[in-house]
Design a protein with these regions (language model features):
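Zn2+-dependent cytidine deaminase-like catalytic core
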Residues: 18-26, 33, 60-160
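Long alpha-helical scaffolds
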Residues: 7-8, 51, 98
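Short beta-strand scaffold segments in enzyme catalytic cores
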Residues: 48-62
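Acidic active-site catalytic centers that drive phospho-/nucleotidyl reactions
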Residues: 10, 28, 50, 90
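Short, basic/aromatic recognition patches
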Residues: 23-47
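Single conserved hydrophobic/aromatic residue that forms the stacking wall/gate
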Residues: 1-15
């Protein structure tokens, strides 16, 4: 009987893990949709990116790509090239945390585009432990750096419901 109860226990544990994974997957999709909606606040014409930082199922920060505070809300120059001082969504979300009483240590970042290498460095230093994204950036070096740092990286396909 011990083998049967042990096997039943294993099945029960797997079912609980599947349920937990399914719930996490549903949450990931919802937060990514919210980050996508948040990206609509960006004044950038070429690409709109949104980011949320979530800890204990609470959004503790948000950001979208754009110019620094006090600058004109124009991201591209006359040749449609992104100005060098435009901040990425991840950087905006992380710097908001720095100006608040919150901590991003152990949090999850939801970002509509996979992070570039510069943002990956900020994510690592901010103590974020998980990154969920929904669009591939042309370069994968940011994702590789996050993985090297032991950060869980998850791609969510928003085309499937």
């Amino acid at each position: 009987t011990h083998c049967i109860s042990s096997a039943a226990s294993d099945v029960y544990k797997r079912q609980r893990m599947d349920t937990a994974n399914s719930k996490q997957s549903d949450l990931d999709k919802r937060y990514i949709r919210m980050a996508s909606i948040w990206s609509e606040n960006s004044y950038c014409q070429r690409r709109k990116v949104g980011a949320l930082i979530v800890k204990d199922k609470m959004i503790i920060s948000d950001g979208y790509n754009g110019t620094p505070s006090g600058f004109e809300n124009v991201c591209e120059d006359d040749n449609n090239v992104t100005k060098p001082y435009v901040l990425h969504a991840e950087a905006n979300a992380i710097t908001k945390i720095a100006r608040s009483n919150n901590s991003s240590d152990g949090a999850t970042m939801y970002v509509t585009a996979s992070p570039c290498i510069e943002c990956a460095k900020l994510i690592i230093q901010a103590g974020i432990k998980r990154v969920v994204y929904s669009e591939h950036y042309r370069l994968e070096d940011g994702i590789e750096l996050l993985k090297r740092a032991g950060i869980e990286v998850v791609f969510v396909d928003t085309s499937e419901k």
